A protein has these predicted regions:
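Conserved acidic carboxylate
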Residues: 5
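C-terminal output helix
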Residues: 15, 102-115, 119-121
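Hydrophobic/aromatic residues positioned on beta-strands within the core alpha/beta folds
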Residues: 80-82
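Receiver (REC) domain active-site loop signature in two-component systems and cognate sites
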Residues: 56
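Two-component/phosphorelay signaling modules centered on CheY-like receiver
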Residues: 8-27, 95
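Acidic, metal-coordinating helix/loop segments flanking the phosphotransfer/catalytic sites
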Residues: 27-49
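Active-site residues of response regulator receiver
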Residues: 53
Length: 123
Protein backbone atom coordinates (compact mmCIF):
# COMPACT_ATOMS: atom_id res chain seq x y z
CA UNK A 1 0.00 0.00 0.00
CA UNK A 2 1.09 3.56 -0.58
CA UNK A 3 -0.07 6.18 1.92
CA UNK A 4 0.18 9.83 0.92
CA UNK A 5 -0.35 12.51 3.54
CA UNK A 6 1.63 15.68 4.16
CA UNK A 7 0.94 15.21 7.89
CA UNK A 8 3.75 12.91 9.02
CA UNK A 9 1.87 11.81 12.13
CA UNK A 10 -1.22 10.81 10.14
CA UNK A 11 0.91 8.97 7.58
CA UNK A 12 2.89 7.11 10.25
CA UNK A 13 -0.25 6.21 12.19
CA UNK A 14 -1.98 4.75 9.13
CA UNK A 15 1.22 2.97 8.13
CA UNK A 16 1.38 1.33 11.57
CA UNK A 17 -2.29 0.29 11.39
CA UNK A 18 -1.75 -1.33 8.00
CA UNK A 19 1.50 -3.05 8.95
CA UNK A 20 -0.01 -4.49 12.12
CA UNK A 21 -2.77 -5.91 9.94
CA UNK A 22 -0.27 -7.65 7.67
CA UNK A 23 -0.04 -5.17 4.80
CA UNK A 24 3.17 -3.87 3.29
CA UNK A 25 2.81 -0.09 3.56
CA UNK A 26 4.96 2.81 2.42
CA UNK A 27 4.27 6.35 3.60
CA UNK A 28 4.96 9.36 1.38
CA UNK A 29 4.66 12.96 2.50
CA UNK A 30 4.87 14.52 -0.97
CA UNK A 31 2.42 13.55 -3.74
CA UNK A 32 4.68 14.85 -6.53
CA UNK A 33 7.53 12.67 -5.31
CA UNK A 34 5.18 9.69 -5.08
CA UNK A 35 4.18 10.21 -8.74
CA UNK A 36 7.85 10.31 -9.75
CA UNK A 37 8.39 7.04 -7.93
CA UNK A 38 5.45 5.47 -9.79
CA UNK A 39 6.81 6.70 -13.12
CA UNK A 40 10.30 5.37 -12.33
CA UNK A 41 9.05 2.15 -10.72
CA UNK A 42 11.05 3.07 -7.60
CA UNK A 43 8.97 1.26 -5.01
CA UNK A 44 10.53 -1.78 -3.32
CA UNK A 45 7.37 -3.85 -3.79
CA UNK A 46 4.21 -3.84 -5.87
CA UNK A 47 1.77 -1.15 -4.79
CA UNK A 48 -1.67 -2.79 -4.59
CA UNK A 49 -3.59 0.34 -3.54
CA UNK A 50 -3.15 4.01 -2.70
CA UNK A 51 -4.61 5.86 0.27
CA UNK A 52 -4.27 9.62 -0.05
CA UNK A 53 -5.26 12.75 1.78
CA UNK A 54 -7.19 15.41 -0.11
CA UNK A 55 -5.62 18.70 1.01
CA UNK A 56 -1.84 18.79 0.63
CA UNK A 57 0.64 21.51 -0.34
CA UNK A 58 2.01 21.56 -3.89
CA UNK A 59 -0.59 19.11 -5.22
CA UNK A 60 -4.07 18.20 -4.01
CA UNK A 61 -5.29 14.66 -3.73
CA UNK A 62 -7.50 15.13 -6.80
CA UNK A 63 -4.57 16.43 -8.86
CA UNK A 64 -2.50 13.46 -7.71
CA UNK A 65 -5.23 10.98 -8.69
CA UNK A 66 -5.71 12.60 -12.13
CA UNK A 67 -1.99 12.22 -12.83
CA UNK A 68 -1.87 8.70 -11.40
CA UNK A 69 -4.79 7.60 -13.59
CA UNK A 70 -2.77 8.43 -16.73
CA UNK A 71 -0.44 5.51 -16.00
CA UNK A 72 -2.41 3.40 -13.50
CA UNK A 73 -6.07 3.64 -14.53
CA UNK A 74 -7.23 0.67 -12.45
CA UNK A 75 -5.14 0.91 -9.28
CA UNK A 76 -7.46 1.02 -6.25
CA UNK A 77 -7.43 4.46 -4.61
CA UNK A 78 -9.01 5.62 -1.36
CA UNK A 79 -9.22 9.34 -0.63
CA UNK A 80 -9.64 10.46 2.97
CA UNK A 81 -10.83 14.01 3.61
CA UNK A 82 -12.50 16.09 6.25
CA UNK A 83 -14.37 18.01 3.53
CA UNK A 84 -17.52 16.29 2.32
CA UNK A 85 -17.83 18.70 -0.61
CA UNK A 86 -14.40 17.60 -1.91
CA UNK A 87 -15.91 14.34 -3.17
CA UNK A 88 -17.14 16.14 -6.31
CA UNK A 89 -13.51 16.72 -7.37
CA UNK A 90 -13.07 12.97 -7.77
CA UNK A 91 -16.04 12.38 -10.09
CA UNK A 92 -15.08 9.92 -12.81
CA UNK A 93 -11.72 9.07 -11.23
CA UNK A 94 -12.78 5.70 -9.81
CA UNK A 95 -11.87 6.31 -6.17
CA UNK A 96 -13.38 5.40 -2.82
CA UNK A 97 -13.99 8.66 -0.96
CA UNK A 98 -14.13 8.48 2.85
CA UNK A 99 -14.65 11.22 5.41
CA UNK A 100 -12.45 11.87 8.42
CA UNK A 101 -12.34 10.80 11.10
CA UNK A 102 -11.82 7.27 9.83
CA UNK A 103 -11.23 4.86 12.73
CA UNK A 104 -8.68 2.07 12.17
CA UNK A 105 -11.32 -0.66 11.82
CA UNK A 106 -13.14 1.41 9.17
CA UNK A 107 -9.91 2.10 7.30
CA UNK A 108 -9.13 -1.61 7.19
CA UNK A 109 -12.67 -2.59 6.24
CA UNK A 110 -12.79 -0.10 3.36
CA UNK A 111 -9.34 -1.16 2.19
CA UNK A 112 -10.31 -4.85 2.19
CA UNK A 113 -13.39 -3.92 0.14
CA UNK A 114 -11.28 -2.01 -2.39
CA UNK A 115 -8.85 -4.88 -2.77
CA UNK A 116 -11.67 -7.41 -3.14
CA UNK A 117 -13.28 -5.28 -5.88
CA UNK A 118 -9.92 -5.05 -7.64
CA UNK A 119 -9.43 -8.83 -7.50
CA UNK A 120 -12.95 -9.43 -8.82
CA UNK A 121 -12.34 -6.99 -11.66
CA UNK A 122 -9.10 -8.74 -12.59
CA UNK A 123 -10.74 -12.18 -12.67
Amino acid sequence: MLLIDDNAIQAATRQTILRRSGYFAIAALNPRRALEQFQNDDFPAEIRAVITDHIMPEMSGSEFVRELRKTHPHLPVMVISGLEEAEAEYAGLNVAFRLKPLPPESLLSHLRGLLAEDEEGAA
